[in-house]
Amino acid sequence: MSPKKSPFFELRSGSVDTLLFVVKTTDLDAMRAELTRRFEATPEFFANDVVAIDVRRLAENERVPLADIAQLLDSVRMRPVGVVANPQQAWAAESQLPLLEARDRRGATNAAKSADEDIANAAAAAPAVTAATATPPSDLFELAAGTPENGTPATAAAVEPAPAAEPVRLATSSQTMVVDKPLRSGQRIYAKGDLVVLGLVSYGAEVIAEGNIHIYAPLRGRALAGVQGNHDARIFCTCLEPELISIAGIYRTTENPLPADVLGKPVQIWLEEEKLMIEPLRLT
């Protein structure tokens, strides 16, 4: 006989989207200095974002003090929720943080291309601007999109669901979600396929899609396309003023100013050899 359901709580299996803080060094002082350098200009950027500490890049004989790394992340107002480690990294289980499993989004099968060909063709003759030169990768750590999942009951992390944002009217099909209202700070939209936004994406708002993102209004918040590893995803918007843009985990933030020919302009953004490319759209 199955136990009676409780009216007070439920326990379910599930997955939670987080950032992965990918550790690539055991030098804690260098990591602290790099974190300070990268985020001192935007201390609120990752405020209250949940993050899992990923130590799988470390060599088998290397180990780091996970409690100290958690304190470092706290110092930039991130919220560590667990550790992702290889099976042979048994020392990671000694941390007070729970062990998590994670899907490798980069290894996911790419979705079919579904970019707007008319817009792409209109921009074909425009010069491209690469974003990679503005944000060189760090030898110490990376921040990447990830999806830690609950593992066995002994190691699973319980994460409270975020408060629901104010309802937004959506029109969806099997491939595309349409948002016809402006998004205010704190609102977040996730689309399984492509996402079309007809209103302003304000500072502090976030639009996320497994496919392409089309924004027919200013983008001032965050836009993350191809979040399940689709390197062919693109971002299109009519006015680029973002806090963050990301495709398949490759991202760029406002700590690196955008060139004048794309800032506040209609653009498309795509990945080319692991670099974000930003190109003006010629709409007339």
Swiss-Prot record:
Gene3D superfamilies: 2.160.20.70, 3.30.70.260. The keyword Acetylation does not apply. It holds the Pfam family MinC_N. Keywords: Cell cycle, Cell division, Septation. One of its GO terms (biological process) is regulation of cell division. The keyword Cell division applies. NCBIfam families: minC. HAMAP family: MinC (MF_00267). Interacts with MinD and FtsZ. Cell division inhibitor that blocks the formation of polar Z ring septums. Rapidly oscillates between the poles of the cell to destabilize FtsZ filaments that have formed before they mature into polar Z rings. Prevents FtsZ polymerization. This is Probable septum site-determining protein MinC. The lineage of its organism: Bacteria, Pseudomonadati, Pseudomonadota, Betaproteobacteria, Burkholderiales.
